[in-house]
Every structure is written in structure tokens, then in C-alpha cells.
């Protein structure tokens, strides 16, 4: 029996030690894989950059090393990585052109507009771009029209149908569960709360939504018209008369594409452009490959920091939720990062790239203050992405200079408060009973199993009004306007970048490149390089984060599966924990572009 126990014990110890050894070798292999990915890539002569655009487009690239190893990944692309790849390809003499292949790309119109402008700029080098897809979404077709030639599969389609917004209202749904939202707001156009209190859009919200989606569509049509030599009237006619169900041959007849080909035939087309024989291989470079290609002429003396801030503005990250890993602007984290940049003597100016519809009014004010401190030490320039509205505009308004794309959604200067009331759910649906013991009249303020009384509503209305007045004053000070001037364009009113320029909410139209150039000019430096912040998480940081956050894989899958319903569902999930006072655009802004 002793020998048996000894043998079992020895076997267990042996298995344990073997597991440790395998684990060590596994980690060493992973480190080697990560390190090898950073090696400089040599570009072969006569190469082509392949831009495969499919998935969710984020502002900043983040390699999901663990997801790649486990197979639990969902497609996510970084605007910064794509832009860098295009610039490097333009400058590299061995790269002859770009092959653009699109699928389903989750991107806002401003992001597409910025990428399109970069493709147009790429062609100034004399190099070619060809685009191909089995099925173009409307946004991807808009992007593809920057190419010299646009091709489609014979049975492919282009979803060219115009832009629509479909608000979602959850008042009746919540009522079925015994939940009622108590809402207080300031601003005629502050429509974010309508989803809780109304069954349809208010007249003011319908008017402003119609105005800005029309502006987005007009911008898209104008650019496509110029590239394809099709009048905007004709483009609207095609959208109204079902071109989105046409096949390749019909699209060719309408001059929306230059050719109809299968995927294998496109290889022959690219070989022809590269002047290769039929049996020669195409030297291809991906976006990931370009990250390791040395950029030409980047040995500047001074650093211009580009700080990426995108997602909901929150006081602290939401953990332990299916939605916990959605990217967010965490107020405290941003303040710490900006303080470090302020104290870094190597950094001569800071560009803050913002893509946010807002969120916590408290966090927005803290970031406004930190930008104010940063501005006293070095120039601060804002580059707006698809949205820099409400809280996103709050943190923007104090910069030295503000850039927006024509199709950026901005403004929305207003504040509201939402407190859910679960008393009907608890008492009538679940049979729960509550009693009260308190030291003071308002000791139960904020508890969600009761309605606020009139006095509490008055208190909260006062706090929200003060917050609105502070927001309005911040804009007036930052934009050198009077409070009355700000009030005329506030009240929660949403504007496109094009309109925002006319009313002085922004200084100039343009993308991130223009913002960087302006920051360098304000810092009085001609020899500079850019550095992105916050630094992407390395392998070990991702490993630690994965052990504490449970939602990354499921959140990615939810985002892919829910599509346009993802943001409203995330809001319902987070409503009980978010800050009571919010400066944000509507959660339900579903734009079919």
C-alpha cells in the first residue's frame, strides 16, 4: 500500500512539474511571438498594400494577443494603424499601389471621410488604388470611390439608399417590468431622455435630426459625385429607385463601378498593374505588416503627443459586466495621463483625438480642468472624430484650437439627470415590501425603490441647472463668446462640423493630420514626430487585465451580434450605476449609413 501511495504521489508531482515546465516554455514562446511581431519588415520591390477593411473601426489599434492565441477574437481595426499604413505606403518607393477590399465595416461617417481624404492624398504620389467587394455597404462604397477603379462581384450589390435614423423608445418596455425613469433636463433639444419618457420624437428633435443626417448625406453625395462623375441628383434618384438591389451588370450600366469581376480575376488585374507575369506572385503587405515598416523621415527633434479619448465618458470603468470592456473615457485616468504629458519636457504640444457622445458631467468637468492646466504649459489642439458632443464638447471647448470633420456631430450643450424607480417592480411584480427609518427628511434620496418627492426633484433640478450654467460658462470662456451667445446655440442642440464652424464652436475643418500640423505650428517647431497615447497594452498587461475583467470576449461577440442595438442595450445595462447627472447625446442614435 505504501508503494502504491508513493507511486501515485510521484506521478502527481511529476505531472505538476511537467505542467510548470510546459507553462514556462509556453510563456517563452508567447513572448517570442510578440517580440517577433515587432521586427522591422523589409518591403520587397513592386509590392502592394492590401487594405482589408472589415469589422469594428476604433480610433486606436489594440492587439488582442490572448484572443489571437485562443481564437476568441472579433475583428477590430484601428484608425491610427490604417492611417499610418497609407502614409508609409505613399512614401515608400517599393509600394506601387493599394488594393482596397471591404466587407461590413462599423465606422461613422466622419471616420470614413477622414480615411477617404487620406486615400485621395495617397493618389497624389502618382500611385494607383483599386477597390473590390462582393457587397459594398453604403459607407464602404463611399470610401471605395476614392479609388482609381471600383470593381464588384457579378452578383454583388451596393447598399446605396440614403441615411436614416431610427430612434428607439423603451418607456413601455420598462413599464412592463415595473420600472419608471425620473428625468430632469435642461435644454429644448436635449433629447437623450426621450427614449425613457416618450413614444416618438419631439418636434425639436425631429427637426435637428433631419438637419444633421441630411448634411451627412449631402457630404457623401458631393464626394461620390466628384469621384464618379455622377450628379448628386442622379445619386439621389438611384437611392430612391432601388439601386441597392441591383446586380453588378446593372451597377456598371449606371457607372457606379468600373468593372464586374470575380475575386480570382482581381488578382490578374493587380498583376497587370504591377506588370507581373501570370505565374508570378504578388508581394502583399497588410496593415499589420506596415506597422513594422520604418516610416520615412521620422527623425524629428520634438514630440507631438496624440492622445486618444473615445467612448462613453465615465467616472470609473464598469467591471464585472458583459459590457465591461467597451472602450470608455475614464475621467480620472485621462486626468492622470494629461498631467504626465504636461510634465514631460520632451512633449511640445498635445493633440487630443475625441470621439465621444458624452457621459458623466462630473468627469467632463474634471477633464476640462486638466486641459486648462495642460494648456498653461503647452499648446492643446482638439481633433474631433465622428462625435465630440455634449461631454465630448465640454472637454474640447477649452483647447487652443479645435478641428472637426464636416460630418462630425458636435455641440449638444446641455445636461440631464436620470434616476430609475423600481418601486412597482419590487412591490407589485416581485412582492417585496419596504419600510423606512431615517434621521432626516431626505435621508433616502437616490434609493431606487421609491419615487423622488417634490422637494428632492427641486434639489436635483437645481443641481442640473447649475451644471448647465457651468457648462455654458466653460464654452463661453473657451470660445471667447458671451454667455448669451452660447445660449443661442446651446439647449442641447446638435450640429455637424460644417455648421459648428459657422457658429464658432470649432476653428477649422480637417482631420488628425491637420490637427498635428497646427499643434506643431503653435509649439513653433518644424522638426517633430508624433507619439500615440495612452500606450497600447502589452502582452503581460493584457494577461493581467484578462484575469480581472470578464467581459472582453462576450462583449465583442455581443457588439457583433447586436449591431445597432448594442449601444441602447449597453445603456439599459449601465443605467443603475452611471452618474446621476449626464452630459451626453442620445444613446439610441441609430444611423443607417
List PLM regions with ranges.
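Charged, glycine-interspersed solvent-exposed loop segments at helix/strand-loop junctions
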Residues: 167, 171-271, 423-503, 507-509, ...
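Cleft-lining beta-strand/loop regions that shape enzyme active-site pockets
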Residues: 40, 49-167, 297-425
Amino acid at each position: 500500500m505504501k508503494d502504491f501511495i508513493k507511486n501515485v504521489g510521484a506521478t502527481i508531482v511529476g505531472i505538476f512539474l511537467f505542467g510548470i515546465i510546459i507553462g514556462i516554455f509556453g510563456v517563452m514562446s508567447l513572448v517570442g511571438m510578440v517580440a517577433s511581431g515587432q521586427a522591422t519588415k523589409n518591403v520587397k520591390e513592386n509590392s502592394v498594400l492590401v487594405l482589408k477593411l472589415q469589422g469594428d473601426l476604433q480610433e486606436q489599434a489594440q492587439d488582442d494577443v490572448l484572443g489571437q492565441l485562443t481564437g476568441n477574437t472579433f475583428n477590430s481595426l484601428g484608425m491610427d494603424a490604417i492611417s499610418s499604413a497609407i502614409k508609409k505606403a505613399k512614401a515608400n518607393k517599393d509600394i506601387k499601389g493599394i488594393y482596397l477590399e471591404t466587407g461590413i465595416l462599423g465606422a461613422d461617417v466622419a471616420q470614413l471621410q477622414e480615411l477617404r481624404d487620406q486615400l485621395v492624398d495617397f493618389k497624389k504620389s502618382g500611385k494607383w488604388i483599386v477597390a473590390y467587394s462582393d457587397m459594398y455597404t453604403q459607407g464602404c462604397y463611399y470610401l471605395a470611390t476614392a479609388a482609381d477603379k471600383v470593381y464588384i462581384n457579378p452578383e454583388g450589390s451596393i447598399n446605396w439608399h440614403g441615411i436614416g435614423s431610427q430612434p428607439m423608445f423603451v418607456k413601455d418596455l420598462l413599464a412592463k417590468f415595473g420600472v419608471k425613469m425620473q428625468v430632469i433636463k435642461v435644454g429644448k433639444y436635449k433629447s437623450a431622455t426621450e427614449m425613457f419618457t416618450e413614444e416618438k420624437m419631439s418636434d425639436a428633435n425631429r427637426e435637428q435630426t433631419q438637419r444633421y443626417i441630411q448634411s451627412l448625406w449631402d457630404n457623401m453625395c458631393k464626394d461620390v459625385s466628384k469621384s464618379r462623375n455622377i450628379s448628386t441628383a442622379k445619386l439621389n434618384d438611384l437611392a430612391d429607385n432601388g439601386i441597392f438591389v441591383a446586380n453588378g451588370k446593372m451597377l456598371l450600366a449606371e457607372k457606379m463601378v468600373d468593372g464586374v469581376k470575380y475575386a480570382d480575376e482581381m488578382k490578374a488585374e493587380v498583376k497587370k498593374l504591377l506588370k507581373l507575369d501570370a505565374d508570378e506572385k504578388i508581394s502583399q503587405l497588410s496593415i499589420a505588416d506596415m506597422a513594422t515598416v520604418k516610416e520615412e523621415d521620422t527623425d524629428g527633434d520634438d514630440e507631438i503627443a496624440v492622445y486618444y479619448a473615445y467612448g462613453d465618458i465615465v467616472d470609473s470603468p464598469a467591471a464585472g459586466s458583459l459590457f465591461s470592456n467597451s472602450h470608455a473615457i475614464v475621467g480620472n485616468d485621462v486626468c492622470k495621463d494629461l498631467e504626465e504629458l504636461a510634465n514631460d519636457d520632451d512633449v511640445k504640444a498635445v493633440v487630443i483625438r475625441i470621439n465621444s457622445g458624452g457621459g458623466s458631467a462630473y468627469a467632463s468637468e474634471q477633464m476640462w480642468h486638466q486641459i486648462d492646466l495642460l494648456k498653461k504649459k503647452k499648446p492643446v489642439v482638439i481633433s474631433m472624430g465622428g462625435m465630440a458632443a455634449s461631454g465630448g464638447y465640454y472637454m474640447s471647448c477649452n483647447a487652443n484650437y479645435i478641428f472637426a470633420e464636416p460630418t462630425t456631430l458636435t455641440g449638444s450643450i446641455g445636461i440631464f439627470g436620470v434616476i430609475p424607480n423600481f418601486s412597482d417592480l419590487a412591490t407589485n411584480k416581485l412582492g417585496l415590501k419596504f419600510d423606512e427609518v431615517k434621521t432626516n427628511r431626505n435621508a433616502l434620496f437616490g434609493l431606487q425603490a421609491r419615487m423622488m418627492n417634490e422637494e428632492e426633484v427641486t434639489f436635483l433640478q437645481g443641481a442640473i441647472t447649475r451644471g448647465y450654467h457651468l457648462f455654458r460658462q466653460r464654452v463661453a470662456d473657451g470660445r471667447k463668446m458671451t454667455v448669451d451667445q452660447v445660449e443661442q446655440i446651446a439647449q442641447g442642440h446638435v450640429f455637424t462640423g460644417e455648421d459648428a464652424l459657422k457658429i464658432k464652436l470649432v476653428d477649422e475643418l480637417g482631420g488628425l493630420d491637420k490637427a498635428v500640423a497646427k499643434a506643431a505650428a503653435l509649439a513653433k517647431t518644424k522638426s517633430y514626430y508624433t507619439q500615440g497615447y495612452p500606450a497600447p497594452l502589452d502582452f503581460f498587461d493584457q494577461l493581467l487585465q484578462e484575469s480581472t475583467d470578464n467581459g472582453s470576449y462576450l462583449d465583442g461577440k455581443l457588439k457583433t451580434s447586436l449591431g445597432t442595438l448594442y449601444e441602447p442595450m449597453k445603456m439599459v445595462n449601465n443605467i443603475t450605476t452611471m452618474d446621476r447627472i449626464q452630459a451626453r447625446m442620445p444613446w439610441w442614435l441609430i444611423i443607417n449609413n
